[in-house]
Amino acid sequence: ILDNVESRGLGDVYKIQIDVFGSRSRAYVQVQNGCDHRCTFCIIPYGRGNSRSVPAGVIVDQIKRLVDKGFNEVVLTGVDLTSWGADLPSAPKLGDLVMRILKLVPDLSRLRISSIDSIEVDENLMQAIATEKRLMPHLHLSLQHGDDLILKRMKRRHLRKDAIAFCEEARKVRPEITFGADIIAGFPTETEEHFQNSVNLIKECELTWLHIFPYSPREGTPAAKMPQVNGNQIKKRAAVLRDLGKKQVKSHLSSQLGKNHNILMENAYMGRTEQFTEVKFDKQQVEGSIVLGKITDANEKQLFATAI
């Protein structure tokens, strides 16, 4: 298989394809590398080149091997994951890959997809989100900002309304879904009004897991040549977003009290729900197993559970 992959110019993707978390609990499978887009703040395309996809058959074979070795969960990763397939024959979409994995690897208990560009989500992927219970109800979105002018200057392909519409639609078809997101604070030319639109977007989309990045110029990128925001102001805005993120997490955790979850054990006492929420058990469990647990309590960072 490796020879076939390298003959397609995909050896670089294949060689870093699998990362293991814990002992037989979760495996990360890189199915795509590089990026065809040129966001004005990003240096990745200059270092990793254009988008390259691992063929679906290779991915399925690898996941079958992981399942045979005892892994209960696989996470599909990539630099620009939703662009997967564009460079392959017939240009399949990420949704096609997800459906194929779930069909051909019936013993895979849980499949996750990592950071995605919501504007590129295809019909089959949305269908999988709605109907495939083995596809976990947790999506991390590459949103970056909540203001249309800043999004344009970032050279993003979505508008604020697109992000809101996607979250509303996904929540409509999968009510238990949670969202994470990347948000940049202090992008060049960002005013207080622009910043408030990011704050409001987090609330309107009901984002839970936030990755906040204070803007830092990357040499050679268009954004580095734009008028910069004062460094102290960037830090203050990033702090505001992080504080909001803590409140969003606390709200989510509180909403889970009394509920039952299937929890994948990362070690003897700690695991993750379907929504990737961290859970600590009162008694030791089998690492790598999936345990049905009742949520009994929560603090600011995690849930607590008893096995049922």
State the predicted function of each range:
Residues 85-104, 154, 160, 214-247:
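Radical SAM enzyme [4Fe-4S]-AdoMet core and its adjacent flexible, acidic
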Residues 48-75:
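Conserved alpha-helical substructure of the radical SAM core
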Residues 39, 59, 76, 113, ...:
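Conserved, mostly hydrophobic/aromatic
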Residues 225-308:
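Terminal RNA-binding accessory module
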Residues 1-14:
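Single conserved hydrophobic/aromatic residue that forms the stacking wall/gate
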Residues 68-192:
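Conserved SAM/AdoMet-binding glycine-rich loop
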